[in-house]
Amino acid sequence: MKNLLLLALITLPLVGFSQLWNQVSNFTGEGRHHPITFSNDNYGFVMSGSNLNDAHKYDKSNDTWTQLQNVPFSSRNYSYGVNIGDKAYMGFGYDLNGQFPTDWWQYDMNNDSWLQLANFPGSGRLHPAMIVVNNKIFVGCGNNSSGNLGDWWEYDVLTNVWTQKSNIIGNNRHHPYYFGIGNYAYVGFGH
């Protein structure tokens, strides 16, 4: 009895800190590997992946999925995207032709429109780090047919200009962890 009471005292406080999951509407598109995903306060977006070129929007207000116009770039895997406000920026990956594209795109979430931006001037890649800090997007690491990469780039969304920065300290890598806090980008680990 004492053991049971002790177990209850230990586990009861943890119940209040457990996560609660709710099922939402199932995704209406085809299942996929490594799509581009991003969101704003109202919608979540799933685009491309598994060499598909479709795009979908999830509306949390009515728990529905809507298929949008197809992405204007070649379908690809391992692409990445981030957003600043209601604009998403995306590129990179690996396409059906075995290429590592360097095209760079802006997607307007409010009116489902696309704008091709300045191409990435470095080597195409998959699994890069992509971090937003203020109005700049930092991209680096990743890998391609040459192996792991360690270069680091800054994209200014206000001027549509890419600038190469100092390479990452340490080993070249792909698929690292990454995040931005305040005015700093943090990157580490990876393969």
Label each residue range with its predicted role.
Residues 1-20:
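Bacterial Sec-dependent N-terminal signal peptides
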